[in-house]
From Swiss-Prot:
Keyword Transmembrane part of the UniProt annotation: yes
Compartments it resides in: Cell membrane
Top-level taxonomic group: Bacteria
Stated name of the protein: Malate-2H(+)/Na(+)-lactate antiporter
Residue spans crossing the bilayer: 9-29, 30-50, 73-93, 96-116, 136-156, 192-212, 233-253, 258-278, 309-329, 357-377, 405-425, 428-448
Species in which this protein is naturally found: Bacillus subtilis (strain 168)
Membrane topology per record: Multi-pass membrane protein
Entry's family note: Belongs to the NhaC Na(+)/H(+) (TC 2.A.35) antiporter family.
Keyword Transmembrane helix: yes
GO cellular component: plasma membrane
InterPro entries: Na/H_antiport_NhaC (IPR004770), Na/H_Antiport_NhaC-like_C (IPR018461), NhaC_Na-H+_Antiporter (IPR052180)
Chain's role: Couples proton uptake and Na(+) efflux to the substrate-product malate/lactate antiport, in an electroneutral malate-2H(+)/Na(+)-lactate exchange. Plays a role in supporting growth to high density on malate at reduced protonmotive force.
Length: 468
């Protein structure tokens, strides 16, 4: 077998620099699909791999392994696409929009959005499902109320990621805890010390900003026109929400996400036939092609013409190519070399915390997927925590914060692509309003350097995870 070596820091800088140059030049200057940039990046990384002594077969297996790490996300993405299509056709999403316009006052809309998405994400454990259902409805309501969509998207994502990093049902919660060798409930308790203060601060911010709007930009005629248009197009009744309630209940019962979402999509198709008068073939087709309608209201068309598996294909390709690139970087040991370069400076809980957050963010940038970040960060950083006798709960918490809360900030990552596509708001537009993410990251750094809620273990084992 041919000897292989780790890359030098210079080689890493070259490869990652070329990656960023490709992504930026393709998307910003050449107006080419980001998928092409990610695909070309495979071969840039493979050239480095061959230089390091790896065979083509080794590198191909690394790509396959990287993609396999995110297959669950791919399956959920396909399922959510089907769900959105049938739920619009079945009147579920239109009913959510209607009642939101009816009962939510503009002054508290942003706070209500944060709370609604938080409750749903904690109950279901999925940020993607939350954004694909409640998120779509809140975006539509926000547009109807005249509230800037990037601000609405920030409230949606703050609520959605709150549950994704805290719910015991969340795959990210389970992944961060298991790879850090921490009991999942011990991990959740450790997260509470960070999540609750961050959530309160975020809620205050959205409340203050919400009252600044206070209905000043609201066009009441537009709201009433939108409500009447929804009633004229769909059968709007409270029982239209039964599929949504059932999905939330099943996910809260810890049933597997993908089958539950598929059941929800099937119910949406049934609702489309029974309550909306759609023929069976057309109702089923909305799961694949998405919902499509032409009304005299252009605004309504923009709200409702979406969903379907087809609508997710571009995102799927980005995720697959991104996961493959992340698999190559993991195989080549890129992040491990970066961390080892600065390891001598990791002499305090604060420095280790900051480094963990940076590694997790870099893994999202170059690994292009939250799963890559959550898998690699604990593996790369665990020795530094053990060397300082830091409890593994601190590792799992920092990995979760850095991996989950920054995943939606990267335009070419799985979360960035999905959130921007579903909400119709670009990543860079909603990024400044992801207040929960910024507050939580800031608190994690403060905790690290002040020693607040930082736990140690004398015997350098993970037994301390059971404390507190």
């Amino acid at each position: 077998m041919k000897d292989v070596r780790l890359p030098t820091l210079f080689e890493i800088i070259i490869v990652l620099g070329v990656f960023l140059a490709l992504v930026l030049s393709f998307t910003v200057f050449l107006d080419l699909p980001i998928q092409l940039a990610l695909f070309v990046s495979w071969f840039i990384a493979m050239l480095l791999g061959i230089r390091l002594g790896y065979s083509y077969k080794d590198l191909q297996n690394a790509i396959v392994h990287g993609i396999s790490n995110g297959l669950e996300a791919v399956l959920i993405l396909v399922s959510v696409g089907a769900l959105i299509g049938t739920w619009i056709a079945g009147g579920v999403v239109p009913t959510l929009i209607y009642y939101g316009l009816e009962f939510i006052h503009p002054s508290i809309f942003l706070l209500a959005t944060l709370i609604i998405c938080s409750i749903m994400s904690v109950a279901t454990g999925t940020s993607w499902g939350t954004v694909g259902t409640a998120g779509i409805a809140m975006i539509a309501i926000g547009e109807g109320l005249g509230i800037p969509l990037p601000l609405v998207a920030g409230a949606i994502l703050s609520g959605a990621y709150f549950g994704d990093k805290l719910s015991p049902l969340s795959d990210s919660t389970v992944l961060a805890s298991s790879l850090s060798k921490v009991d999942v409930l011990a991990h959740v308790r450790a997260m509470l010390y960070l999540s609750i203060p961050a959530y309160v601060i975020t809620a205050i911010l959205f409340t203050v900003v919400g009252f600044m709007y206070g209905g000043k930009n609201i066009d009441l005629d537009k709201v009433e026109f939108l409500k009447s248009s929804l009633q004229n197009t769909f059968d709007i009744h409270i029982w239209m929400l039964i599929p949504a309630v059932l999905v939330i209940v099943l996910l809260a019962m810890k049933k597997p996400s993908m089958p539950v979402i598929v059941i929800g999509a099937l119910l949406g198709a049934i609702w489309a036939v029974v309550f909306q008068g759609m023929d069976i073939a057309h109702a089923i087709a909305t799961a694949y092609n998405g919902f499509s309608i032409k009304t005299d209201v252009e605004f309504l068309n923009g709200l409702l013409n979406r969903g379907g598996i087809v609508g997710m294909l571009d995102s799927l390709v980005v995720i697959i190519f991104g996961l493959g690139f992340g698999g190559l970087l993991e195989k080549l040991g890129v992040l491990k070399v970066i961390v080892s370069t600065f390891e001598k400076k990791l002499t305090s809980a604060g420095n280790v915390t900051l480094s963990t957050l940076i590694v997790a963010f870099l893994a999202n940038i170059f690994g292009c997927a939250m799963y890559v970040s959550l898998i690699l960060t604990p593996k790369i950083m665990e020795d530094s925590y053990d060397r300082l006798h830091l409890d593994r709960r601190v590792l799992s918490r920092n990995s979760e914060v850095g991996g989950t809360l920054t995943s939606g900030m990267v335009p070419w990552s799985d979360n960035g692509i999905y959130m921007a596509g579903i909400l119709g708001v670009s990543t860079f537009s909603y990024l400044p309003f992801m207040w929960l993410s910024f507050v939580a990251i800031g608190l994690a750094i403060i905790y690290g350097y002040t020693g607040k809620f930082i736990w140690y273990t004398k015997n350098n084992t993970v037994k301390a995870e059971k404390l507190g």
